Amino acid sequence: MGFLDLPFMLKAFRFRRLVVEDGKRRKKKKPLWLTPVSHGYYTVDRLSYADNSSNDDSVFVQREQQSDELEIWLFGVSNAGTGKEIVKYMQNHLFDKLPNELGIMRKCKETMRRAYVEEERTGGSAASVMVVNGEKLAIASIGDHRVVVCKDGEAHQIRDRKASTKHWSQFIFPVCNQGEEEDESDPRNSELVVITEKINSDTEFIIIGSPGIWEVMKSQEAINLIRHIEDPKEAAKCLAKEALNRISKSSISCVVIRFG
């Protein structure tokens, strides 16, 4: 009798294993929010000064989540008026037709590049960051607005990878060119840069800052100043206040995006 029931038992075992494996596959499809995203921003109000009223910044923060598996954050700082046009373009060409997760980064990069084309023609200045599912970044900048990523306490300024390639003279005469790599006033910064990269375990936070931040402090200075501040709102306020204390002449606005 036991031998007669053996085929049935084998079928039941196969069915049970199939259900378990299918359950595992379904669990893998669920999004894992391993990297929480928090943010804060601060703008120094200079409307009372007539000579600075034309240099005010626009700060924009927008979150889009159309499904349980796709969340997009858009952060940015730009010249007044520029930010509105960038966000408007994003809304019309990305947020209303979000692709699936596989094609989202390519779509983000293409849309950001097109959104910045007009600013590139008119000499506008802006910087923005897209955070997709707390796992990937799409970053764009043009002009004097800058994006700096903190990785294990070190500042990484976003630049075009091709433009950042060393010239042959830097290998032959490293001493003579030692200061060139650290020159943050490089004219190449005025060119449009759009890149994508992953958020790794060493990615701590991101600073998006206006010219008023960067004309009075280096990228590493800004990182060192706020790295110990866990609240991104307080970090952004601290950074802006420090720029003001250093008598920055340009507009002062910043966004701090913290991971984990």
UniProtKB/Swiss-Prot annotation:
Residues 41-259 form the PPM-type phosphatase domain. SMART domains: PP2Cc. Transmembrane segments: none annotated. SUPFAM superfamilies: PP2C-like. GO terms for molecular function: protein serine/threonine phosphatase activity. Belongs to the PP2C family. This is Putative protein phosphatase 2C-like protein 44. It comes from Arabidopsis thaliana (Mouse-ear cress).
